[in-house]
């Protein structure tokens, strides 16, 4: 059972009305952001994209004229958004202390899974966010993190903590070649 509330720490009551049976909570932890960006709204769409991959509702669509049904991995799951990033002129900022506060709130909210699609986690034993993930894991929460976009070489994977699932994407040309 979800223990949180659908509220904005930014003081905008309109965000509570955006909650529904899919989005059951929305929190902003962007405390260092300029005041106009302190909302739980997804400023660049990345969080919404990953949330739909994880928990998108089942929908019927047409793909090249063929009707198909698609959904996220867990279409009956509910989402609580914990916004920890905000836009800046140089791209964006995700402060570690904001992430730690959001993980602590997720533990209090009784979530089952945390999806953290933000790079980082250089040192599992000295990084505050990685240690917050350890607290979440100790509370019985599965933590899935981004492996990052730094490349295939050794040491380029983010979030190497043994208590998280570091998740990556790949592509494949579907060709298997063999020389005889």
Give residue spans per PLM region.
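Hydrophobic beta-strand scaffold residues
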Residues: 140-143
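Active-site core of PLP-dependent enzymes with the aminotransferase class I/II
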Residues: 121-130
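Active-site glycine-centered loops adjacent to acidic/histidine catalytic or metal-binding residues
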Residues: 148
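Subtilisin-like serine protease catalytic core
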Residues: 1-95, 109-112, 124-125, 138, ...
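Alpha-helical segments flanking ligand/cofactor-binding loops in enzyme cores
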Residues: 104, 131-134, 158
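Short glycine-/small-residue-rich Rossmann-like dinucleotide-binding loops
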Residues: 28, 118-119
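Short, well-structured alpha-helical segments in soluble
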Residues: 98-110
């Amino acid at each position: 059972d979800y223990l949180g509330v659908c509220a904005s720490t930014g003081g905008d009551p309109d965000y509570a009305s955006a909650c529904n049976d899919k989005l059951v909570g929305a929190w902003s932890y962007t405390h260092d952001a300029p005041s106009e960006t302190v909302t739980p709204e997804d400023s660049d769409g990345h969080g919404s994209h990953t949330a739909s991959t994880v928990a998108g509702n089942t929908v019927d669509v047409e793909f090249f004229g063929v009707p198909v049904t698609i959904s996220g991995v867990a279409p009956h799951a509910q989402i609580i958004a914990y916004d920890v990033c905000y836009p800046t002129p140089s791209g964006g900022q995700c402060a570690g202390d904001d992430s730690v506060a959001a993980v602590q709130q997720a533990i209090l909210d009784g979530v089952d899974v945390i999806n953290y699609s933000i790079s980082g986690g250089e040192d599992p034993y000295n990084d505050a966010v990685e240690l917050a993930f350890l607290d979440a894991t100790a509370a019985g929460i599965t933590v899935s993190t981004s492996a990052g976009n730094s490349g295939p070489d050794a040491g380029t994977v983010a979030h190497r903590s043994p208590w998280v699932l570091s998740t990556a994407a790949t592509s494949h040309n579907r060709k298997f070649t063999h020389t005889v």
